[in-house]
């Protein structure tokens, strides 16, 4: 136990000694640390580090400030440049202002003043003149009470007079106060004052030293003193008005008032101030040659006669509204600009009004009062032309392209262009589900626009595809209806080969183009057998009928030699052959009602007389054809053919044919009219030959196939038996 306690004590004491030693070292280190921290070197080092950090922050702030100052400098440079520009402009404006203040414009220095200062528009008999000449007249006004300036018309072709047979020419007398209004005293013709319409033509001033014609337009000595006094007063008043208008503050207002409409009104007001109760004539001046005056009168008479014939050859087209408001050239001589051109067309409503005036053998514009003449002039410039509505269908021949085409009628070339444009638009819009040719109705305004574009071969828009299809249907219905009416007249009245009958039928070229268009639509799956317009069906039926008629015609030509009688009889009795009567009936069914509705839409209020005529002629044709089918065909003798139980055999002699034909010609007129329409079917089918060949085929059949040419029969008998191809009615009236 004692040994254990001694070891413990020994270790505890050792630990205490180590603890004292460590504590002494700690105190010594603390003392050294305190001394070091309180030394100057440590304090300087701390200050150094602090200053170094401060310097770094100052450098960063300096860089940012430098960038900001650079941006400010750039902005200041731009502002400075702008200010310099404004200052320079202000200096230039200030200099101009000082020049204007120091040198004000003086307008009354003399006749040699600058022409470029001011050009107020003046008017003389509805014509515009340059202002410089008017100012010169105004300046010379103070020297003489009534100075005049004469003018000669340089272009005699462009002169328009109020009457055709007037031997006195109007002299252009310009008073000195012509800055606002200059008028010519009107001639007195049968108590009616005429207001002359004017047109553009140059007027040159005649020098006083040239040919002694300076005073050729002076006031007539026979004029009353009262009228002269009134003109003097008006001249003095207008002279003062000119001087007031030349002031700078009134220039803007004068420029606004110098419009063509205001000029016409002012000229009318000024003309009312001058009493026109006393008639006077302008004597032929001594300086002017009478031949020149006669030449001018002849030219104006020709222009007036051409104006009277305008209503017969007028074509409706749009008149562009163009007004020349430019100032006259300062270096040019005195010129006259006239309000209208003589070649402008009139609207249809004005054409009717002009024709009424022509029945009274008066001038187109002389017969009207002055107020109505001004209204007529303004209407010609601003009115919209209404299209001429025509009920006739244009000819489908190629020669019709050279003739003038009405605006409301589609030509063949325009129709072909329309079909080609539709096909091109269909190819561009190659999509499924396009529904075209579903409606035939179209707005009248849109119809006229499309017709105008097609006639001019213009480009059509894709948006108008449905409207173009409707126009094709309408045009096809018109052609089919005209063809149907032509066939009806051929069947009833026996019209032969004339120009009028040729224009009725659908040309072969149009028909082939329509068939090609139908094939194109079928190829692109736009139309099929189930969905097909009635007019397209009629065109296809008409084409099939004409093809069958061609084959029958070829067979008939071969029967003249007696080679193929069997084939002709089979063609005649073939139930599949389309007869002309059937085609006409189908055409009427498909085109009659639809075309009547179309014309009611396009031309409301117009009575469709042609449709009624076609219905009556169709009824007559059906009755006659029914009688023809019921009648016995065995009584008809045809050269080389005999109809017996559906078989055809050749006859033994041709002399018997001529004898039977002669005996049949001695019937009564009534029976002759009935027998005239009795023909075999293969001969009736010739009536459906294409287009312009229709009348030619009928004439050939009657002259050769039916009557024949025999060597045994005499020429006189054949001449009596042969029917007249020129006029069937005269042949019938001979037996009445």
Curated annotation (Swiss-Prot):
Enumerate the UniProt keywords alphabetically: Cell projection, Coiled coil, Cytoplasm, Cytoskeleton
Composition bias type Basic and acidic residues, residue spans: 210-219
Q: Where is this region: Disordered?
A: 192-238, 279-305, 323-348, 642-690
Q: Which domain of life is it from?
A: Eukaryota
Q: What is this protein called?
A: Centrosomal protein kizuna
So what family is this one in? Belongs to the kizuna family.
GO biological process assignments: spindle organization
**Low complexity: bias regions:** 658-668
What function is annotated for this protein?
Answer: Centrosomal protein required for establishing a robust mitotic centrosome architecture that can endure the forces that converge on the centrosomes during spindle formation. Required for stabilizing the expanded pericentriolar material around the centriole.
Main localization of the protein?
Answer: cytoplasm
What GO cellular component is one of the record's annotations?
Answer: cytoplasm
Coiled-coil zones: 10-35
Which InterPro entries does the record associate with it? Centrosomal_kizuma
Transcription among the record's keywords?
no
Compositional bias of kind Polar residues = 192-208, 328-339, 678-690
Tell me where it resides.
Cytoplasm, Cytoskeleton, Microtubule organizing center, Centrosome; Cytoplasm, Cytoskeleton, Cilium basal body
């Amino acid at each position: 136990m004692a040994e254990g306690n001694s070891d413990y004590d020994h270790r505890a004491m050792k630990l205490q000694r180590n603890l004292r030693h460590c504590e002494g070292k700690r105190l010594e280190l603390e003392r050294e640390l305190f001394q070091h921290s309180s030394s100057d070197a440590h304090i300087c080092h701390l200050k150094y580090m602090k200053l170094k950090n401060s310097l770094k922050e100052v450098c960063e702030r300096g860089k940012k400030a430098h960038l900001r100052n650079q941006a400010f400098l750039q902005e200041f440079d731009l502002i400075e440049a702008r200010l310099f520009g404004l200052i320079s402009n202000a200096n230039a404006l200030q200099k101009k202002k000082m020049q204007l203040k120091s040198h004000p414009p003086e307008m009354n220095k003399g006749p040699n003043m600058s022409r470029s200062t001011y050009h107020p528009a003046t008017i003389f008999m509805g014509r515009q003149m340059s202002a410089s000449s008017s100012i010169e007249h105004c300046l010379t006004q103070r020297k003489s009470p009534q100075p005049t300036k004469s003018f000669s018309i340089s272009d005699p072709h462009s002169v328009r007079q109020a009457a055709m047979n007037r031997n006195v020419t109007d002299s252009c007398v310009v008073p000195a106060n012509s800055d606002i209004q200059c008028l010519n005293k009107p001639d007195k013709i049968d108590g009616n004052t005429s207001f002359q319409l004017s047109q553009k033509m140059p007027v040159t001033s005649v020098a006083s030293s040239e040919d002694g014609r300076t005073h050729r337009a002076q006031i007539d000595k026979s004029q009353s003193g009262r009228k002269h006094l009134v003109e003097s007063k008006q001249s003095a008043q207008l002279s003062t008005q000119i001087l007031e208008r030349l002031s700078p503050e009134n220039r803007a207002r004068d420029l606004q008032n110098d419009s063509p409409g205001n000029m016409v009104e002012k000229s009318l007001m000024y003309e009312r101030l001058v009493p026109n109760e006393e008639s006077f004539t302008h004597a032929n001046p001594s300086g002017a040659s009478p031949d020149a005056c006669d030449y001018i009168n002849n030219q104006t008479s020709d222009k007036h006669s051409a104006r009277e014939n305008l209503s017969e050859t007028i074509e409706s087209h749009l008149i562009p509204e163009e007004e020349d408001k430019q100032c006259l050239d300062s270096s040019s001589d005195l010129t006259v600009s006239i309000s209208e051109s003589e070649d402008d067309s009139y609207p249809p409503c004005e054409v009717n009004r002009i024709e009424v005036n022509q029945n009274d053998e008066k001038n187109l514009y002389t017969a009207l009062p002055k107020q109505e003449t001004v209204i007529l002039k303004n209407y010609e410039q601003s009115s919209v032309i209404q299209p001429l509505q025509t009920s006739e269908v244009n000819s489908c021949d190629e020669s019709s392209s050279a003739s003038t085409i009405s605006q409301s009628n589609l030509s063949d070339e325009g129709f072909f262009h329309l079909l080609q444009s539709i096909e091109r638009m269909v190819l561009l819009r190659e999509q499924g589900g396009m529904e075209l040719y579903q409606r035939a109705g179209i707005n009248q305004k849109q119809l006229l626009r499309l017709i105008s574009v097609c006639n001019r071969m213009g480009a059509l828009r894709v948006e108008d595809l449905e409207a173009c299809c409707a126009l094709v249907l309408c045009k096809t219905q018109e052609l089919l209806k005209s063809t149907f009416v032509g066939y009806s007249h051929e069947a009833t009245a026996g019209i032969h080969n004339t120009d009028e009958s040729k224009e009725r039928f659908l040309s072969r070229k149009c028909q082939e183009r329509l068939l090609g268009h139908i094939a194109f639509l079928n190829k692109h799956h736009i139309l099929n057998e189930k969905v097909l317009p009635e007019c397209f069906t009629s065109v296809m039926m008409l084409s099939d009928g004409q093809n069958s008629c061609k084959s029958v015609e070829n067979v008939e030509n071969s029967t003249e030699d007696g080679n193929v009688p069997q084939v002709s009889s089979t063609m005649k009795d073939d139930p599949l052959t389309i007869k002309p009567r059937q085609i006409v009936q189908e055409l009427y069914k498909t085109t009659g009602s639809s075309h009547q509705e179309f014309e009611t839409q396009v031309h409301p209020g117009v009575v469709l007389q042609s449709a009624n005529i076609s219905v009556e002629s169709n009824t007559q044709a059906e009755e006659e054809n029914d009688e023809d089918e019921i009648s016995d065909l065995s009584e008809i003798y045809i050269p080389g053919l005999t109809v017996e139980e559906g078989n055809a055999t050749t006859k033994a002699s041709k002399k018997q044919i001529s004898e039977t034909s002669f005996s049949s010609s001695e019937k009564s007129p009534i029976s002759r009219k009935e027998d005239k329409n009795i023909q075999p079917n293969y001969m009736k089918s010739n009536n459906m030959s294409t287009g312009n060949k229709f009348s030619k085929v009928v004439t050939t059949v009657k002259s050769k196939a039916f009557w024949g040419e025999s060597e045994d029969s005499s020429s006189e008998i054949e001449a009596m038996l042969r029917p007249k191809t020129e006029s069937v009615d005269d042949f019938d009236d001979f037996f009445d």
